[in-house]
Each structure stands twice: as C-alpha cells, then as structure tokens.
Swiss-Prot record:
This is Apolipoprotein A-I. Its main location: secreted. Belongs to the apolipoprotein A1/A4/E family. The modification Methionine sulfoxide is found at M110, M136. One of its GO terms (biological process) is negative regulation of cytokine production involved in immune response. The lineage of its organism: Eukaryota, Metazoa, Chordata, Craniata, Vertebrata. Participates in the reverse transport of cholesterol from tissues to the liver for excretion by promoting cholesterol efflux from tissues and by acting as a cofactor for the lecithin cholesterol acyltransferase (LCAT). As part of the SPAP complex, activates spermatozoa motility. Sequence repeats lie at residues 68-89, 90-111, 112-122, 123-144, 145-166, 167-188, 189-209, 210-231, 232-242, 243-266. It is found in: Secreted.
C-alpha cells in the first residue's frame, strides 16, 4: 500500500514529462500549476452551472411559491468559497513543494527513462508523419479531377459523385490503416521497455525498505501539517456559511408557514 501511494505521487509529479512524450508544442507545467488550473476550471464551472440551476428553480412555479431567495445569498456564498480558496493556496503550495522535493531523485530517474525511450521511437513517429502527409497529398491529387469535373457540371446527380469518390476514400482508408498498424508494431517493443523500466524502478523502491519508510514518514508528516494549517480556513468557511444557512432556514420556514395557511383556508 505504501508503494502504491508513493507511486501515484511520483507518477503525478512526472505527469508533464510523460505527456510530452507525444506532445512537444507546450511548455511543461509544475504539479501545483496543473492542480490550480484543474481546480479553478472545476470550481468556476460548478459555480456558474449552480447559479444557473438556482435561477431556473427560483423562476419556476415551485420556486416562486417557496420564495427562498437563494440568488440573494449566492454572491455571499461565492465570496466565502473564494476566500477559502485563497487561504488554502499557500498551504497546498507548500505541500506540493515538499512532496516534489522528497521525490526528486526518483522522478529524475523516471524522466530519464522516458527521454531515452522517446529518442528511440522518434524516428518512427517522424516516418509516420511523413507517410501520412504523402497520403494526403496523393488523396488531393486524385480528388482534383473529380472536383473539376463536378464544377463543370459533368455530374447530373450527387450519387454519381459519391460513386466515384468511394473507391478513392476506401483506398486512402486502407493505406492509412496499414501505416497505423505498422507504427503500432514498431512502437510495441518500446512500450514494453518503458513498462519494464517503470516496474524495475518500483520494485527497487519496494525492496529499499528504509528509503520507502522514510518517504512514507515524510509524506505523513506533510499531510498532518497540511491538515493543521487548513483548519483555520475551514473554520472561516463554516462561519461564512452560517448567515447563508440561517437565511435559507428562515425563508424555507416562512414558505412552509404560508403554504400551511393556504391549505387551512381551503
């Protein structure tokens, strides 16, 4: 179990390098940058969609009848959540910095393995890209006469054009599949090599009991520190939510009382 936890941490911290095994057009992000980006996108999405749902509910017949005024408290709730995010920022930043530092050597070894395998497969990727471009050029050349013929009105029906295009498209499809199959065959040994290297690194880590225990102790220490430092932020969140919850409670009870009066008067 210890090895699994540490493995996940190391793989996450080396995620940018593994991703750039196939992509080279974007600069690598730090682990904390990736966490912040994902969290920001998720929170903003939930916030916007949540506000839309609340708005739809309040404009519905039931919402108008209950008159809970949820949107009146939405900005207050959003402000409280944003404040929590700001308070936790430095704390979680410190946690990831410590974890990244503790696993630096192992990550360097794994990144080295990735780069070595990447260098071996790059010629196959370049060759595949070249062949693919050649196929596209050939496809364009074969389509040119058909396009000209179509523009000149030689085809009276669209079905005629489809019939002439079908063999060309099937030929391109079959040739593309052949290239992909060839590339898959060429890359298979290197994929196995990469998995074997990773397995070797992890096995060495498991056999190194003292080192693994040290990593485990440091990780537990960092998590405990994170929990202690986050307590004030969550207490602030709780205090910030109290007025919102109290307002909701009052509105809801008022709506129930009004509904009960209507029932008794019928």
């Amino acid at each position: 179990m210890k090895a699994v936890v540490l493995t996940l941490a190391v793989l996450f911290l080396t995620g940018s390098q593994a991703r750039h095994f196939w992509q080279q057009d974007e600069p690598p992000q730090s682990p904390w940058d990736r966490v912040k980006d994902l969290a920001t996108v998720y929170v903003d999405s939930v916030k916007e969609s949540g506000k839309d749902y609340v708005s739809q509910f309040e404009t519905s017949a039931l919402g108008k009848q209950l008159n809970l005024k949820l949107l009146d408290n939405w900005d207050s709730l959003t402000s409280t959540v944003n404040k929590l995010r700001e308070q936790l920022g430095p704390v979680t930043q410190e946690f990831w910095d410590n974890l990244e530092k503790e696993t630096e050597q192992l990550r360097q070894e794994m990144n080295k393995d990735l780069e070595e395998v990447k260098a071996k497969v790059q010629p196959y990727l370049d060759d595949f890209q070249k062949k693919w471009q050649e196929e596209m050029n050939l496809y364009s050349q074969k389509l040119e006469p058909l396009r000209t013929e179509f523009q000149e009105g030689a085809f009276q029906k669209l079905q005629d054009l489809r019939e002439k295009l079908r063999p060309v498209a099937e030929q391109v499809r079959d040739r593309a599949r052949a290239h992909v199959d060839t590339l898959r065959t060429q890359l298979a040994p290197y994929s196995d090599e990469l998995r074997q290297r990773l397995a070797t690194r992890l096995e060495a880590l498991k056999e190194s009991g003292a080192t693994l225990a040290e990593y485990q102790a440091k990780a537990s220490e960092h998590l405990s520190a994170l929990g202690e430092k986050a307590k004030p932020a969550f207490e602030d969140l709780r205090q910030g939510l109290l007025p919102v919850l109290e307002s909701f409670k009052v509105s809801f009870l008022s709506a129930l009382d009004e509904y009960a009066k209507k029932l008794s008067s019928q």
